[in-house]
Amino acid sequence: MMHLKNIKSENPKTKEQYQLTKNFDVIWLWSEDGKNWYEEVNNFQDDTIKIVYDENNIIVAITKDASTLNPEGFSVVEIPDITANRRADDSGKWMFKDGAVVKRIYTADEQQQQAESQKAALLSEAESVIQPLERAVRLNMATDEERARLESWERYSVLVSRVDTANPEWPQKPE
């Protein structure tokens, strides 16, 4: 199975390549071990999955046809077309690590960013519930049930706003 690492654009290495670059603006892609992508792409097997991954091992593309890839700035590996490998996608939630496709392992910073996004989404959801209830109270149109619901959502909103995204513990959402 082929594995081309750290593919980057570099200068042509032969007179023929130089001429192609001069005439057609060809960009030459080379792996870290000096292999030419355009020659190697034909050596991938037809019955395998080709995975493109970045410098952090995050999968950014998956295909059966290597000729459809533009791997500049990435690495490409072919893996067996088996069920365990077919579960991966290019959503950013999978990685190629130690020769296998695995669920992505997030760094502490990435986990905190995800928690911050979740916090913002939960606060937005709470505000969308709170606003019409506040309006009903302000206009003296709220039922006792709506007043109680408003209070529980406001309490929830305050608790969410206090969540430490470095170590999140999310409060129970009101019903």
From Swiss-Prot:
GO terms for biological process: adhesion receptor-mediated virion attachment to host cell; symbiont entry into host cell; viral tropism switching; virus tail fiber assembly. GO terms for cellular component: host cell cytoplasm; virus tail, fiber. Chaperone involved in tail fiber assembly. Remains associated to the tail fiber and participates in the host receptor binding. Binds to the primary receptor. Two alternate tail fiber assembly proteins U and U' are encoded extending the host range of the virus. The orientation of the G segment is defined as G+ and G-. G+ orientation provides S-U fibers whereas G- provides S'-U' fibers. S-U and S'-U' dont have the same host range (e.g. respectively E.coli and C.freundii). This is Tail fiber assembly protein U. The keyword Ubl conjugation does not apply. It is found in: Virion; Host cytoplasm. Belongs to the tfa family. Disruption phenotype: Viral particles lack tail fibers in inversion-defective gin mutants (blocked in G+ orientation; no switch to S'-U'). It holds the Pfam family Caudo_TAP. Induction: Expressed in the late phase of the viral replicative cycle. Expression of late genes is activated by the viral late transcription activator C. Expressed alternatively with tail fiber assembly protein U'. The switch from S-U to S'-U' is performed through inversion of a DNA segment called G by the phage invertase protein Gin. It comes from the Viruses. Keywords: Chaperone, Host cytoplasm, Host-virus interaction, Late protein, Viral attachment to host adhesion receptor, Viral attachment to host cell, Viral receptor tropism switching, Viral release from host cell, Viral tail assembly, Viral tail fiber assembly, Viral tail fiber protein, Viral tail protein, Virion, Virus entry into host cell.
